[in-house]
């Protein structure tokens, strides 16, 4: 085994490195330690010299950019004849950095945005995308006209910040028109101005070239119809004005017209004479309604005059009605339940032969009696049945003989009741004329007199 402690030749340990070399090696990887040994020295007495060289010195604190110029860097690397690099400055640098545009790809067949040339039709057509759908704006003869149509639609759809082909100042006049129209209406305006609109179209709203050579004015989608025909005219302007008048009449001041609505202001103001006639017509209507209401009040107040006990009102009404009220069925239907309850409290009597089923009220009876002939009213013969008595209130039946201290004129003594044979003949004749089966009811002749009813018959 080797004796390491008693080694005869102990090699001298190399001297430690300088602290600067240790620090530089730990701090940066660009530093290197180089050992230089002179050639003329003896092997035994040779001194080892360690030199540290920094190839890339650290940056100066607080300074920006390179710490030394380009020739100093060449000196570090000991490179001869290396030219210093030149930094790119000036407008060329700004041009190199391009701004990302919001615009999409341009048309492949046109230099304008939103314009495409179709060889089949030979026209330049304009389109715009809205909500994921392509909206057709029309076909034009030139690409410039199609581009202007696209610009107007883009401003309407996306505002003044939209990407357009020309300057925004060129469309200042169109901005006013855009504010009054919706998207759909503005698209229709652009299509009418295009040359690719269907045959017979016009640049005016509601105007179409008829096959006879004249211009037809019409309104579309009015009152559920497809269109309303307004007439044929010699020129487009006349047809457009006819459409404007019709639109103003239907939609008022908010109507969309071809020309300025102010030029039609004088046509829709009614003249003074027409206003006077309308006032007289309204006066006649008001008088007619007041007369009708007065008549209704008089008819409705007849019962009050008879039963109220006022005195003079009942005797002053000398009018003879020409016909009974025609709405008696409606009035009777409304009070059917009340009359049924009232009739249930009175004994039911078999009715006498009734020729007519018209309603009869005390005021009508008074009118018949006041005509002078108690048995006849305008040549009309009536037979009052017992069934009618149940429809009158009891207070009217009791107070009919003396209302308000006045005595009613009593008709002359009624003729004796007809015999059974005469009644049967009358019933048969009445049934034959009215197409109803005959019905004869017999009862005591004194019952009518006890209840205050008298038969009205035509005198022979």
Curated annotation (Swiss-Prot):
SUPFAM superfamilies: DNA-binding domain (SSF54171). It is found in: Nucleus. Transcription factor. Involved in spikelet transition and development. Prevents lemma and palea elongation as well as grain growth. Required for seed shattering through specifying abscission zone (AZ) development. The keyword Membrane does not apply. It comes from the Eukaryota. One of its GO terms (molecular function) is transcription cis-regulatory region binding. This is APETALA2-like protein 5. May form homodimer. Residues 1-12, 19-36, 87-98, 420-429 have a biased composition (Low complexity). Disruption phenotype: Several spikelet and inflorescence developmental defects, including altered florets palea and lemma structures, abnormal numbers, size, appearance, and identities of floral organs, reduced primary branches number, and longer and fewer grains associated with a loss of grain shattering. Crook-neck-like rachilla between the sterile lemmas and the rudimentary glumes in place of the spikelet abscission zone (AZ). Induction: Target of miR172 microRNA mediated cleavage, particularly during floral organ development. Induced by SH5 in spikelets abscission zones (AZ). Triggered by cold stress. Residues 111-167, 203-260 bind DNA. Residues 1-39, 87-111, 284-319, 398-429 are annotated as: Disordered. Belongs to the AP2/ERF transcription factor family. AP2 subfamily. It comes from Oryza sativa subsp. japonica. A motif (Nuclear localization signal) lies at residues 99-108.
